[in-house]
């Protein structure tokens, strides 16, 4: 009988899946733990819930004790990290210690490592490399096509299974796809999957959205969950069903209700970004885009060019950070800058009009502001940003934003970029009607 890992019970004696990330560099925050996030999403796609994630440093005794604890409360443990040849790679040894078993050399694995590394005879007896070849006698090996550290699938006791993977994301992912998915589906899945569809919002906060969809947030299947990010909001709709089509049918009416309520604010779904949506719309209209940036210092350009295909619409950007460059590159008179100030609606508008002309683009966006932490005044505090958008038929849109002084410099820059892209998106949307 397969263990049921698909329930949502919160009872303390309820068993399930756990993820254990091993490595002092993760514990100290020197490296971001992307593996756990990725595995969590994979488990959801397989229809499994996991109830706990743990991170532990490179200490054999602590790892061993924690694995003993996990074996008492979970059916399946997935570990990442600690499988390499260095002294602080302790995972396999610690697991063996947890269950008081002996590790045995797999000679075929050593042959694989020698072949991969083309080892000279003087290095072939290197014990640190060879430690990667030792496993419990009855463990199933998960081969590593991209590295030297194999993982394993092992059942140390009835009702408990361990899957181990190296910490290198590219190695872990290919091993997972080639071995783990099939094993988990055969041994732990009850035929249900979780399928999610995410709606991406801009220009509206989480609290305002939540107020209007209180009834949807209480749904059990599908569930609706908000995830706020800097300047954006995601609503993830997740259904549990026997197949993807059934899940999509459960999600469909909820998605339609949300789109009806928030049509102006929803810019895309799933992995779509403001940049990708904007580029798609400009391509459809056969129109081009250029920027004149001051306080964002090129971040707006960097954001748009991260999207494949941006070269078909994006002409370029004039980074006029100093007043001198505003004069020489954008032809803004010195006396005009002195009169209104470099951070002003008037200068932002001059920047966008002149950038559009110089870059020969259909649309242009200019931005000038005070990102802080210094440089603000009572009249123009830190966080003030002026955005101006110019387009065909003498179109001009001017926007003034004052972001909270509690925001740091990078946050103000990122929020400013978000407003720029979303504002042009809304302008194009209004012209499409």
Swiss-Prot record:
Gene3D superfamilies listed in its UniProt record: 3.30.70.2860, CinA-like, MoaB/Mog-like domain
PANTHER family in UniProt: NICOTINAMIDE-NUCLEOTIDE AMIDOHYDROLASE PNCC, NMN AMIDOHYDROLASE-LIKE PROTEIN YFAY
Top-rank lineage group of the source organism: Bacteria
Protein name, entry field: CinA-like protein
Pfam family, one: MoCF_biosynth
Lineage, broadest ranks: Bacteria, Bacillati, Cyanobacteriota, Cyanophyceae, Synechococcales
InterPro entries for this protein: CinA, CinA-like_C, CinA_C, CinA_KH, Competence-induced_CinA, MoaB/Mog-like_dom_sf, MoaB/Mog_dom
Similarity field: Belongs to the CinA family.
Native species: Prochlorococcus marinus (strain MIT 9515)
Family matches, as CDD domains: cinA
């Amino acid at each position: 009988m397969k263990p049921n890992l698909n329930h949502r019970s919160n009872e303390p004696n309820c068993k399930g899946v756990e993820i254990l990330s091993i490595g002092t560099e993760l514990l100290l925050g020197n490296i971001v733990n992307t593996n756990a996030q990725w595995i969590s999403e994979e488990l959801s796609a397989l229809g499994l819930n996991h109830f706990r994630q743990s991170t532990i440093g490179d200490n054999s005794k602590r790892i061993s004790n924690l694995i003993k604890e996990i074996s008492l409360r979970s059916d399946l443990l997935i570990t990442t990290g600690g499988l390499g040849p260095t002294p602080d790679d302790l995972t396999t040894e610690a697991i063996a210690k947890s269950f008081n078993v002996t590790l045995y050399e797999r000679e075929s694995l050593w042959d694989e490592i020698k072949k991969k590394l083309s080892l000279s005879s003087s290095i072939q007896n290197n014990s640190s490399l060879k430690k990667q070849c030792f496993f419990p006698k009855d463990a199933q090996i998960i081969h590593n096509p991209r590295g030297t550290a194999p993982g394993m699938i092992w059942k140390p006791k009835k009702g408990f299974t361990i899957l181990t993977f190296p910490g290198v994301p590219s190695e872990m992912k290919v091993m997972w796809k080639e071995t783990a998915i099939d094993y988990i589906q055969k041994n732990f899945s009850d035929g249900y999957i979780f399928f999610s569809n995410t709606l991406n919002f801009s220009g509206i906060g989480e609290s305002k959205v939540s107020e209007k969809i209180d009834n949807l947030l209480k749904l059990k299947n599908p569930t609706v969950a908000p995830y706020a990010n800097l300047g954006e909001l995601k609503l993830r709709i997740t259904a549990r069903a026997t197949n993807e089509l059934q899940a999509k049918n459960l999600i469909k009416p909820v998605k339609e209700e949300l789109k009806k309520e928030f049509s102006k604010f929803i810019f895309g779904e799933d992995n779509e970004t403001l940049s990708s949506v904007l580029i798609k719309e400009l391509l459809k209209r056969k129109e081009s885009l250029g920027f004149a940036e001051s306080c964002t210092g090129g971040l707006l350009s960097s954001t748009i060019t991260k999207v494949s295909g941006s070269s078909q619409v994006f002409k370029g950007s004039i980074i006029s950070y100093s007043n001198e460059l505003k004069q020489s590159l954008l032809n803004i008179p010195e006396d005009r800058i002195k009169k209104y100030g470099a951070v002003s609606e008037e200068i932002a508008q001059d920047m966008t009009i002149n950038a559009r002309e110089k870059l020969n683009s259909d649309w242009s966006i200019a931005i000038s502001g005070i990102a802080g932490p210094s440089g603000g005044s009572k009249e123009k505090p830190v966080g003030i940003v002026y955005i101006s958008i110019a387009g065909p038929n003498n179109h001009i849109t001017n926007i003034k934003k004052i972001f909270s002084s509690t925001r740091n410099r990078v946050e103000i820059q990122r929020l400013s970029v978000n407003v720029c892209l979303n504002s042009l998106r809304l302008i194009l949307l209004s012209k499409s009607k």
